């Protein structure tokens, strides 16, 4: 009788990772930090799985971090860091090398694209970075999404920055 009960209990196949209202978190972070936090528009079927403000981290670089998940479980993380110093940036990018620079059509913003050297069996989230600096601040995108997905997200970020 116990076996029959176990077999008829429906299984929940939904994602166990909650969707986060990253826009609300960004608004709260902007209000508390007095920094211009960016909450880019997402493409259809993309959602956020985490968003947080690190106002007083050990490395002394305050930042907003948000993760985005695509319809096929692609992942792109975004770090918007304030008061970035060369050491912090070098440590963050220590496992990747500069591959090329990229600018969206008509944009003044230059994204430095970094990639991990070949050899990893499985792609890791921090094997691929797009980085731009604006004054003493930086925006870093990283993850397993395609180059086209990174390009689209970078365009959406630039739209929030007011860069055309």
Regions found by a protein language model. Name each.
Residues 11, 95-96, 157-160:
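Alpha-helix boundary/capping residues
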Residues 24-124:
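Short, solvent-exposed recognition patches
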Residues 12-25:
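Ser/Thr/Pro/Gly-rich low-complexity linker/stalk segments immediately outside membranes or between
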Residues 9, 30-35, 159-162:
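Generic surface-pattern signal
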Residues 1-10:
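Hydrophobic membrane-insertion alpha-helices, especially the h-region
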Residues 6, 100-164:
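A short, solvent-exposed beta-edge/loop patch
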């Amino acid at each position: 009788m116990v076996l029959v009960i176990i077999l008829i209990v429906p299984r929940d196949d939904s994602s166990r990772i909650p969707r986060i209202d990253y826009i609300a978190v960004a608004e709260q972070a902007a209000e508390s930090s007095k920094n211009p936090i960016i909450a880019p528009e997402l493409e259809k079927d993309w959602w956020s799985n985490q968003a947080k403000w690190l106002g007083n981290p050990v490395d002394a670089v305050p930042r907003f971090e948000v993760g985005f998940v695509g319809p096929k479980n692609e992942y792109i993380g975004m770090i918007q860091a304030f008061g970035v110093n060369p050491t912090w940036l070098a440590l963050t990018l220590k496992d990747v090398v500069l591959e090329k620079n990229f600018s969206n059509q008509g944009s003044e913003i230059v994204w430095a694209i970094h990639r991990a050297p070949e050899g990893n069996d499985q792609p890791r989230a921090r094997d691929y970075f797009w980085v731009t600096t604006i004054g003493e601040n930086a925006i870093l995108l990283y993850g397993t999404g395609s180059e086209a997905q990174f390009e689209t997200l970078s365009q959406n970020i630039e739209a929030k920055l007011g860069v055309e």
